[in-house]
Amino acid sequence: MNIETTITRAWQRQAAWLWLLLPVSWLYSLLMILRRQAYKAGIFSSYRAPIPVMVIGNITVGGSGKTPLIIALVRHLQQQGIKVGVISRGYGGDSSQMPALVNTESVPNIVGDEPCLIVNMTGVAMAVCPNRQQAMTTLLASYPDLQLIIADDGLQHYALQRDIEWIVVDAARGFGNKQLLPTGFLREPMSRLKGANVVYHQKADSLSSTDDKYDDTCPPTKRLRMHLQPDNLERLWSFDTQSDGLATVKAMAPEKGSRVHAVSGIGYPQRFFDTLDTLGFQVSPHPYPDHHDFSLTELLRYTEHPIIVTSKDAVKIRALLMQETINQTNQTNQTLSDEYNELGSRLWVLPVTAVLSDGCYEILQQQLQTLNIAISSKEHERVIT
């Protein structure tokens, strides 16, 4: 078990020994404050894009539902006729090949898994680079008519000036012991919520609730809500369509009550496991670190029962299987091993759709109008599909 996994599990349990790291958290807090003030004072230079920038981020380490929210917002803006683009760090990709534009042919080991997912789901114009300014200029060079840029996970990237900030909070996970790294899993103090719109990612039955324990951290007018709606299971890999008919494997989606392997390499895998449990599956959880690069050996380890993964993990696993298909067909004169065929028949992905409260769309429209970005006056849809 590596140190990342050890500390992540300690955060989840709120282990007592974490308080021994408090002096490190104090130092981290001091450096973070000095850094932010340096940007405010102009000691460190920051970049002002020629068009408005909307930052979507969080103040915690790990997943909060940020990517589904971005997909939902992009789709909504596209439906309103607004020309929107997205930039991202491209975590997990090859920084030596960045800045890079992302398209439906991009692969996660080059541009990152989340950018691949966002573009595959929306077709949005997107660029990736650890240097957000370079990502921005690359994107605008190819798409000069964009009206709005969404910066994925750029909340702490103060070198990029922004016009709108939305912070996503997982209300079920909360803030743990409410301490900064490494004692807790906060990137910034909870007071940071006061300066932005805060989207509370909640369970579906609490979407309209206003009674949550974090309400004192930001004004009521800035509190927004969303939840993730699971969709029908989809085949992750279909040999008859993805390997030129070299093999045909038919499979039925696992039924409620059946045992499944839940394999996840996301920031907060427990949410995924809980969702499958709520859907009625008997879940065998297999958590991996965020942005994990799965191997065929790891997947073959989970035998007998169906394997269900998230959309984000499916991006990498699909690329892995495509490469393995090429390797096997080249080596064995266009035949695939029985073991590989059997694995493909058991792989499923659980897509989710972000369902936003009406307040999200109302606030968004107000913010866009303030920035002189025209938006359709037609009635907003709460569920974006």
Swiss-Prot record:
Listed GO biological process terms: lipid A biosynthetic process; lipopolysaccharide core region biosynthetic process
Pathway(s) served: Glycolipid biosynthesis; lipid IV(A) biosynthesis; lipid IV(A) from (3R)-3-hydroxytetradecanoyl-[acyl-carrier-protein] and UDP-N-acetyl-alpha-D-glucosamine: step 6/6
Enzyme class label: transferase
Any one Gene Ontology cellular component term annotated for this protein: plasma membrane
Keyword Nucleotide-binding annotated: yes
The protein's Enzyme Commission number: 2.7.1.130
Source organism (scientific name): Psychrobacter arcticus (strain DSM 17307 / VKM B-2377 / 273-4)
Family: Belongs to the LpxK family.
Name of this protein: Tetraacyldisaccharide 4'-kinase
Pfam families: LpxK
